[in-house]
Swiss-Prot record:
Zinc-finger as UniProt keyword: no
UniProt-annotated binding residues for Ca(2+) 1: K239, D242, I244, D246, D252, E253
Residues spanning the signal sequence: 1-18
EC assignment: 3.4.21.45
Annotated localization: Secreted, Extracellular space; Secreted
InterPro entries: CFAI_FIMAC_N, CFAI_KAZAL, FacI_MAC, Kazal_dom, Kazal_dom_sf, LDL_receptor-like_sf, LDLR_class-A_CS, LDrepeatLR_classA_rpt
Listed name of the protein: Complement factor I
Disulfide pairings: C33-C255, C43-C54, C48-C59, C61-C93, C67-C86, C75-C106, C141-C181, C154-C214, C186-C196, C229-C247, C241-C256, C259-C271, C266-C284, C278-C293, C327-C453, C365-C381, C373-C444, C467-C531, C495-C510, C521-C550
Noted disease: Hemolytic uremic syndrome, atypical, 3: An atypical form of hemolytic uremic syndrome. It is a complex genetic disease characterized by microangiopathic hemolytic anemia, thrombocytopenia, renal failure and absence of episodes of enterocolitis and diarrhea. In contrast to typical hemolytic uremic syndrome, atypical forms have a poorer prognosis, with higher death rates and frequent progression to end-stage renal disease.
One Gene Ontology term of the molecular function aspect: metal ion binding
UniProt keywords, alphabetically: Age-related macular degeneration, Calcium, Cleavage on pair of basic residues, Complement pathway, Disease variant, Disulfide bond, Glycoprotein, Hemolytic uremic syndrome, Host-virus interaction, Hydrolase, Immunity, Innate immunity, Metal-binding, Protease, Repeat, Secreted, Serine protease, Signal
Family the entry assigns: Belongs to the peptidase S1 family.
Record gene name: CFI
Length: 583
């Protein structure tokens, strides 16, 4: 049976064949990941909303002035008008008591309400809504009702854990004279049902009306086969990792080895709804949900009367207005595959983020250009007392015959060592170099250099992903190399099996090949280990740090894990220089 589960997991990861049902929670979820209690506010796993930003792994509220200025006016429940939806949501994020009311200006009589009718308790019943510009209340259509809408409705009613996935509302025969109902569509993370899109539909009777049971902690005890959400809610383990946000805080979809049902599995271990694939919006932080899409699917709907604005479309529009950093995209793509140990030289343009750190003796280490005037490298490469002696050389592919017309030489203004760098253990082996600006210039000019992106999440790349290491290091016979070389290596899971307690999993990364045929070596230190996401955007995943017996089996190279230092880097260089997305 275990072999069967392993085979199914292989199909899910490599062939996206994930239409199976798992019998054990261990088959589905990563325990180490679950222990970190990720939710929809964990930017290691998900993108923050446009009115939030990522700080130390958590989506926190922006201030309203940090939102894009373009947009349509909206009204909040306190009758205050806001120039944009983003500004209203930003203030709501800071002060949760005030919610979205309607798109457009505020009116004295405008009111939105949600209530549950014909239930035995205040936590269950048929869902009835009064829209702002409608005179009467209407029931919600059952045909459009899902856990997304149910969770939002219950949250709007004050049930913080959303809807109950186990209990069902038993509806007896009712005499309701209504020929219409409201079709509602939510994304599932709205804080009020007013943010969802409503259209009017015809109905045949009360059987067509949506009902819900909201989750009440006192009414539920753990099941034998339960999954506990981060918010304290219990759901069946069979509802975890299926692409449906049953928990309401998304914690059941963020630590998944594979996906059940129709869920789409992101490499970062997140399950998203299958309809999010190829919908024009990147939902996987690794981007693969929008790769290979011929076009966006259009949905044909029956003739309806649209009653409210599409605020999810407005959210996407605001997201498109956020500044995006240009990094990690080369002007030319390499097509050859060479080894850094025993390989041939790189071509001009293959590695536009690679720099050489030179002192009086020659190239001592490599470095990575990350934008502005900033170079990322290894702390062990540098000495504070030699700051004025270092030079940064860019566009160097041949150290013996340098192309001086193309090479740009910059001098070092200052070096920032990680405050917890340990020269004995190589912990926190990372440093920043700020290059001097020429004259009165505001920035450094490196016309042929392209910055590598700085990763914000440790889940962007996984063991067995293929990445590239580069440098001017020695070959395995200790022979000096004078041309820039690069080679492909695979990320290797926890290297404690090779290096024991000298390997610190949180701040170190392992990469190489099990036969040692490709490796970084002496002289490559400080240089880049770069990985490309599904859209061929390059991230500096590691900084060459240390290793033993380069090019020998069972001695993979050890790198400083850059994602662990995103906040440290952004603190020193400024977040706009390294934040590719809204993070």
């Amino acid at each position: 049976m275990k072999l069967l589960h392993v085979f199914l997991l292989f199909l899910c990861f490599h062939l996206r064949f994930c239409k199976v049902t798992y019998t054990s929670q261990e088959d589905l979820v990563e325990k180490k990941c679950l222990a970190k209690k990720y939710t929809h506010l964990s930017c290691d796993k998900v993108f923050c909303q446009p009115w939030q930003r990522c700080i130390e792994g958590t989506c926190v509220c922006k201030l309203p002035y940090q939102c894009p200025k373009n947009g349509t006016a909206v009204c909040a429940t306190n009758r205050r008008s806001f120039p944009t939806y983003c500004q209203q949501k930003s203030l709501e994020c800071l002060h949760p008591g005030t919610k979205f009311l309607n798109n457009g200006t505020c009116t004295a009589e405008g009111k939105f309400s949600v209530s549950l009718k014909h239930g035995n308790t205040d936590s269950e019943g048929i869902v009835e809504v009064k829209l702002v510009d409608q005179d009467k209340t209407m029931f919600i259509c059952k045909s459009s009702w899902s856990m997304r809408e149910a969770n939002v409705a219950c949250l709007d009613l004050g049930f913080q854990q959303g809807a109950d996935t186990q209990r069902r509302f038993k509806l007896s025969d009712l005499s309701i004279n209504s020929t219409e109902c409201l079709h509602v569509h939510c994304r599932g993370l709205e804080t009020s049902l007013a943010e969802c899109t409503f259209t009017k539909r015809r109905t045949m009777g009360y059987q067509d009306f949506a009902d819900v049971v909201c989750y009440t902690q006192k009414a539920d005890s753990p099941m034998d086969d339960f999954f506990q959400c981060v918010n304290g809610k219990y759901i069946s383990q069979m509802k975890a990792c299926d692409g449906i946000n049953d928990c309401g805080d998304q914690s059941d979809e963020l630590c998944c080895k594979a996906c059940q049902g129709k869920g789409f599995h992101c490499k970062s271990g997140v399950c998203i709804p299958s309809q999010y694939q190829c919908n024009g919006e990147v939902d996987c932080i690794t981007g693969e949900d929008e790769v290979g899409c011929a076009g966006f699917a259009s949905v044909t709907q029956e003739e309806t009367e649209i009653l409210t604005a599409d605020m999810d479309a407005e959210r996407r529009r605001i997201k498109s207005l956020l500044p995006k950093l240009s990094c990690g995209v080369k002007n030319r793509m390499h097509i050859r595959r060479k080894r850094i140990v025993g390989g041939k030289r790189a071509q001009l343009g293959d590695l536009p983020w690679q720099v050489a750190i030179k002192d009086a003796s020659g190239i001592t280490c490599g470095g990575i250009y990350i934008g502005g005037c900033w170079i990322l490298t290894a702390a062990h490469c540098l000495r504070a007392s030699k700051t004025h002696r270092y030079q940064i050389w860019t566009t160097v592919v041949d150290w013996i015959h340098p192309d001086l017309k193309r090479i740009v030489i910059e001098y070092v203004d200052r070096i920032i060592f990680h405050e917890n760098y340990n020269a004995g253990t190589y912990q926190n082996d990372i440093a920043l170099i700020e290059m001097k600006k020429d004259g009165n210039k505001k920035d450094c000019e490196l016309p042929r250099s392209i910055p590598a992106c700085v990763p914000w999440s440790p889940y962007l790349f996984q063991p067995n992903d293929t990445c590239i290491v580069s440098g001017w290091g020695r070959e395995k016979d200790n022979e000096r190399v004078f041309s820039l070389q690069w080679g492909e290596v695979k990320l290797i899971s926890n290297c404690s099996k090779f290096y024991g307690n000298r390997f610190y999993e949180k701040e170190m990364e392992c990469a190489g090949t099990y036969d040692g045929s490709i490796d970084a070596c002496k002289g490559d230190s400080g240089g880049p280990l770069v990985c490309m996401d599904a859209n061929n955007v390059t991230y500096v995943w590691g900084v060459v740090s240390w290793g033993e017996n380069c090019g020998k089996p069972e001695f993979p190279g050890v790198y400083t894990k850059v994602a662990n230092y995103f906040d440290w880097i952004s603190y020193h260089v400024g977040r706009p220089f390294i934040s590719q997305y809204n993070v």
